[in-house]
């Protein structure tokens, strides 16, 4: 029978993700429109975004946090280009974004001493094979495969290389031991549902030491430069961005952080995300025609949750179009490079009740098109 209730918010995209519950553009009214980002009010707003981010995440005091251009991609690329090349590199690949980092390292930077450990969608490479005398590049959560690393136990505290982690669809949703990571990057538009185009970069003391002791053989464009006179440019991490940010997007980020504080902070964001995943775990358990793409529970993402459905590609497209036409779910098809299926965002800005409602619609649409 066709469901009668619909999700309050039909936005289940894996990026940009749903705005937080109760979101209103009224929350942006204190944006310093028309003011320079270098002005006192501009700098104060950017510094506030950095401080609230640091406090929310509970980062170590000696880690640096900065706002950088070009989303998570910009944040991660600037570290690949600024820090790699002085020792071997191990890259872990199990979905399209991690594959992109491997391509940049091998085809663009052309680093010869690179080992790529690759697994197919739904699986993880063998983490035991990683050599931490090398620099290690990986994503915490594979946004396009719904597969995450189970923990950070495989990363030694006494590593020689630096660990570079793209954590964009994991941070604010999963328990991440920061001391295991030297570079952490993410974007505003993922777990907290901010706006696009801005990245955030977190550096450990070991990452800073690398930046200050190593100069790459290749030229670096202005928006990749993190040092000045051989020292870390600390201004970047105090709100003096490399280039002009959107003060409107920054205000939106502040609004997301204030919402996150209002629901109880990081622990509650993680709890909300896990409860959202549990909705689908129950749904998959009672329906034999839908399956998680991730092969085991311990590597199953709680944010970008990916599914295989026992339908032909054409029928699956019909199911997705039907749900969009009914205005109950937008942007839930799998990523273009991934196996055909569904990808549904379960981060903290999505309400559990909306996912429960969506499950009813998916079941109805499946029976309609099969």
From Swiss-Prot:
Binding positions for pyridoxal 5'-phosphate per the UniProt entry: 101, 143, 166, 189, 243-244
Cofactor: record remark: Binds 1 pyridoxal phosphate per subunit.
Keywords of this entry: Amino-acid biosynthesis, Aminotransferase, Cytoplasm, Pyridoxal phosphate, Pyridoxine biosynthesis, Serine biosynthesis, Transferase
UniProt catalytic activity: O-phospho-L-serine + 2-oxoglutarate = 3-phosphooxypyruvate + L-glutamate; 4-(phosphooxy)-L-threonine + 2-oxoglutarate = (R)-3-hydroxy-2-oxo-4-phosphooxybutanoate + L-glutamate
Gene3D superfamilies: Aspartate Aminotransferase, domain 1, Type I PLP-dependent aspartate aminotransferase-like (Major domain)
Cofactor: pyridoxal 5'-phosphate
Functional pathway: Amino-acid biosynthesis; L-serine biosynthesis; L-serine from 3-phospho-D-glycerate: step 2/3; Cofactor biosynthesis; pyridoxine 5'-phosphate biosynthesis; pyridoxine 5'-phosphate from D-erythrose 4-phosphate: step 3/5
InterPro entries reported in the protein's UniProt record: Pser_aminoTfrase (IPR022278), Pser_aminoTfrase_methanosarc (IPR006271), PyrdxlP-dep_Trfase (IPR015424), PyrdxlP-dep_Trfase_major (IPR015421), PyrdxlP-dep_Trfase_small (IPR015422)
GO biological process, one term: L-serine biosynthetic process
Subcellular localization, as worded in the UniProt entry: Cytoplasm
Residues that coordinate or bind L-glutamate: 38
Subunit organization: Homodimer.
Family statement: Belongs to the class-V pyridoxal-phosphate-dependent aminotransferase family. SerC subfamily.
Protein name: Phosphoserine aminotransferase
Organism: Methanosarcina acetivorans (strain ATCC 35395 / DSM 2834 / JCM 12185 / C2A)
């Amino acid at each position: 029978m066709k469901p009668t209730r619909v999700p309050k918010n039909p936005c289940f995209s894996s990026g940009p993700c749903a705005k937080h519950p109760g979101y209103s553009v009224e929350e942006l009214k204190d944006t310093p429109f028309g003011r320079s980002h270098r002005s006192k009010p501009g700098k104060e707003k950017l510094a506030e975004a950095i401080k609230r981010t640091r406090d929310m995440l509970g980062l170590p005091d000696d880690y640096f946090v900065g706002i950088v251009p070009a989303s998570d991609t910009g944040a991660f690329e600037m570290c690949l280009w600024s820090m790699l090349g002085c020792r071997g590199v191990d890259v872990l690949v199990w979905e399209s974004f991690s594959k992109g980092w491997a391509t940049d390292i091998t085809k663009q930077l052309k680093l010869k001493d690179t080992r790529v450990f690759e697994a197919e969608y739904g699986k993880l490479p063998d983490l035991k094979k990683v050599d931490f005398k090398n620099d290690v590049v990986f994503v915490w959560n594979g946004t396009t495969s719904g597969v995450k690393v189970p923990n950070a136990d495989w990363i030694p505290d006494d590593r020689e290389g630096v660990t570079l982690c793209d954590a964009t669809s994991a941070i604010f949703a999963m328990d991440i031991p920061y001391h295991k990571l030297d570079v952490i990057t993410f974007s505003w538009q993922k777990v907290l549902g901010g706006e696009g185009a801005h990245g955030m970069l977190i550096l450990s003391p070991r990452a800073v030491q690398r930046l200050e002791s190593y100069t790459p053989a290749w030229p670096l464009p202005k928006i990749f430069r993190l040092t000045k006179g051989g020292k870390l440019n600390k201004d970047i991490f105090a709100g003096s961005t490399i280039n002009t940010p959107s003060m409107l997007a920054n205000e939106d980020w502040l609004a997301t952080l204030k919402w996150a504080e209002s629901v109880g902070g990081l622990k509650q964001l993680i709890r909300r995300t896990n409860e959202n995943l549990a909705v689908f775990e129950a749904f998959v358990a009672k329906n034999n025609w839908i399956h998680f793409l991730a092969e085991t529970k311990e590597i199953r993402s709680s944010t970008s949750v990916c599914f295989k459905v026992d339908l032909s590609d054409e029928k699956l497209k019909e199911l997705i179009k039907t749900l969009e036409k009914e205005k109950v779910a937008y942007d839930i098809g799998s990523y273009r490079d991934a196996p055909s299926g569904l990808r549904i965002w379960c981060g903290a800005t999505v309400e559990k009740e909306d996912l429960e409602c969506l499950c009813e619609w998916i079941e109805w649409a499946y029976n309609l098109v099969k």
